[in-house]
From Swiss-Prot:
Cross-referenced InterPro entries: 4_helix_cytokine-like_core (IPR009079), Somatotropin (IPR034975), Somatotropin/Prolactin (IPR001400), Somatotropin_CS (IPR018116)
Location in the cell: Secreted
Entry keyword Zinc: yes
Name the record gives this protein: Somatotropin
Stated family: Belongs to the somatotropin/prolactin family.
Length: 216
């Protein structure tokens, strides 16, 4: 009887060891199509948020008569222009998925520091509640892109060291004209960079999973 009891305990222990996941990868993985769909939705949301934030700032602080001249003067240089990233859909279609993912990751990571100061320039605005969560949304997208990179890892050369700079933080001294112009330029770059990231992700999703929404 004792032998039977010991055998039963050993069998139970063995079954538990077999069923317990040995590593994170033992859990069911999300389908690649779902990973792409989630990343695209996050990028679209962030791009729209960046565009809305830019418009709100412009409406609140930049006189209408000065907007065109300021935009043409390129008051802020976007660091993303220093990397050999595609500038549009057509160029993006000529790059591999891994290249586009790495460029997307670089763009997102370059804003993780600066956006932590974004909510401070909208303390008296309806945009405050939204802008205060931008950092968390960027982190979510960063994790989504990294998950895609792990799925598609192909051993190709990395481009992660190309963009070492990050953007300056947003200036909270809203009584200074220089600060206003700086923030206006940063928001313009933020909008452009998120548009690029969204474009790259949509190009990848469309060429892997042909669908009617590929025309954009």
């Amino acid at each position: 009887m004792a032998a039977d009891s010991q055998t039963s305990r050993l069998l139970t222990f063995t079954l538990l060891c077999l069923l317990w996941p040995q590593e994170a990868g033992a859990f069911p993985a999300m389908p690649l199509s779902s990973l792409f769909a989630n990343a695209v939705l996050r990028a679209q949301h962030l791009h729209q948020l960046a565009a809305d934030t830019y418009k709100e700032f412009e409406r609140a602080y930049i006189p209408e008569g000065q907007r065109y001249s300021i935009q043409n003067a390129q008051t802020a240089f976007c660091f993303s222009e220093t990397i050999p990233a595609p500038t549009g859909k057509e160029e993006a279609q000529q790059r591999s998925d891994m290249e586009l993912l790495r460029f997307s990751l670089l763009l997102i990571q370059s804003w993780l520091g600066p956006v932590q100061f974004l909510s401070r320039i909208f303390t008296n605005s309806l945009m405050f509640g939204t802008s205060d969560r931008v950092y968390e949304k960027l982190k979510d997208l960063e994790e989504g892109i990294q998950a895609l990179m792990q799925e598609l890892e192909d051993g190709s050369p990395r481009v992660g060291q190309i963009l070492k700079q990050t953007y300056d933080k947003f200036d909270t001294n809203m009584r200074s004209d220089d600060a206003l112009l700086k923030n206006y330029g940063l928001l313009s770059c933020f909008k452009k960079d998120l548009h690029k990231a969204e474009t790259y992700l949509r190009v990848m999703k469309c060429r892997r999973f042909v669908e009617s929404s590929c025309a954009f």
